[in-house]
Design a protein with these regions (language model features):
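C-terminal catalytic/substrate-binding lobe primarily of soluble NAD(P)-dependent oxidoreductases
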Residues: 153-397
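Conserved Rossmann-fold cofactor-binding substructure of NAD(P)-dependent oxidoreductases
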Residues: 59-72, 85
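Rossmann-fold cofactor-recognition segment
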Residues: 47-61
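Helix N-cap at the beta1-alpha1 junction of Rossmann-like dinucleotide-binding domains, i.e.
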Residues: 36-38
């Protein structure tokens, strides 16, 4: 049905490659590209499909990307590289006439700040080129938006309150490790919190607001209010929302390590001089922390991510909770990666599938909740991320 190029051979890229290879009726030709070609070759070896091509590319270099795109001629690029590289890859797609999908919005390397505005400005250029760009097609962002669109389509006339809840109840048996790129992860959770209420954004101190929430099959966990990028698009696309928040669980040991990292200056993203060299402390820390790709083998427990929604249907107030639980061990057995990589990589593959099937094909730049959620929801059940519903239960929020 179509040729796909995956950029990035980390944990998420590895999962995307496995899942793409499992669907040969949709993805007829596959290439994996990364700054380090040997990482791509290792992914292909693990999958056991010698027909998957690999290539070396610097995703910060538009000319290199254009040369690769023009050579392989993919119909769609799945960008699971770093968020810093979103704009160079989008530029290369426009120059080469290639469609685009990513899992995280752009953020500049020198400022710990992320928002969709940089990518939304590409809308007219993609429209004029007749190309589709699908933004934020991981789990959160991604499935969280699709869950919201599904709820709006089937369960509510008006969504008023949205709480996205993300729990990782797994144990990787490390003193401290992040589940995806440490640099991106630590930048995200050390920023101020932010939530939307009554038409305004309310800013909080980092991890200032927290409460215990109960997660299916897991139980109560301390959950902390963070700012997460999908809130920005969801309140725009569902203007009836009065309040939208995002919650994530952290254990006390993790938070203690995080405080120490900040207090000793290792979370800094500016350059410091060391032995006559310029280094960024957070990038150095990333080099000595466990690689998220290596956590899967001994990872136990599961993730639970969902949307808790309150709103009106036929004039009456209702609640709706939709979620997925994902086992780290099952994810590892299938792809060699842990559940956090799995829950991001599977939706990215499904989004590309939706495009190649013509179901999510529309010139412009779009967030996932702007498409029909139904065929995507059907594939979640088939591809390893089954969802569950609780109607008119206690949302706790």
């Amino acid at each position: 049905m179509g040729k796909v190029l995956i950029i990035g051979a980390g944990g998420v890229g590895t999962v995307v490659a496995h899942k793409v290879a499992q669907n040969p009726d949709v993805f007829t030709e596959i290439m994996i590209a990364s700054r380090t070609k040997s990482k791509c070759d290792a992914v292909v070896k693990a999958i056991g499909n010698p027909n998957i091509k690999t290539a070396q590319v610097d995703a910060d270099n538009v000319d290199e990307l254009v040369a690769l795109f023009n050579s392989f001629k993919p119909e769609i690029v799945i960008n699971v590289a770093l968020p810093y590289q979103d704009l160079t890859i989008m530029e290369a797609c426009l120059k080469s006439g290639v469609n685009y999908l990513d899992t995280a919005n752009y953020e500049p390397k020198d400022v710990a700040h992320f928002e969709y505005s940089w990518q939304w400005t590409y809308k007219k250029r993609f429209e004029d080129a007749g190309l589709t760009a699908i933004l934020g097609c991981g789990f959160d962002p991604g499935v969280s938006g699709i869950y919201t669109a599904y709820a709006a389509k089937h369960h509510f006339d008006e969504i008023q309150y949205l709480d996205i809840v993300d729990c990782n109840a797994g144990n990787h048996h490390k003193a401290f490790a992040t589940n995806f790129n440490p640099e991106i992860n630590i930048r995200e959770i050390t920023q101020n919190g932010r939530y939307y209420e009554n038409g305004e954004w309310v800013t909080t101190k980092p991890l200032e607001i927290h409460k215990a929430l109960t997660y299916p099959n897991i139980g109560p966990r301390d959950s902390y209010l963070l700012y997460h990028e999908e809130l920005e698009s969801l309140v725009k696309n569902f203007p009836t929302i009065k309040r939208a928040r995002f919650w994530m669980t952290f254990g006390q040991e993790y938070l203690t390590h995080l405080r120490v990292i900040q207090n000793i200056g290792m979370a800094r993203i500016d350059e410091v001089e060391y032995n006559g060299m310029k280094i960024v402390p957070l990038q150095f820390l990333k080099a000595v922390l466990p690689n998220p790709q290596d956590l899967g083998e001994n990872y136990e427990g599961e993730t639970s991510i969902g949307c808790r929604i309150r709103g009106l249907k036929d004039g009456k107030e209702h609640t709706y909770y939709i979620y997925n639980n994902c086992s780290h061990q099952e994810a590892y057995k299938e792809t060699g990666m842990q559940g956090v990589s799995y829950t991001t990589g599977v939706p990215a593959m499904i989004g590309a599938m939706m495009f190649l099937k013509g179901l999510w094909k529309r010139p412009g730049v779009w967030n996932v909740e702007e498409f029909d959620p139904d065929p995507f929801m059907e594939q979640l059940n088939k591809q390893g991320l089954p969802w569950h519903e609780v109607i008119d239960g206690n949302l706790e929020v």
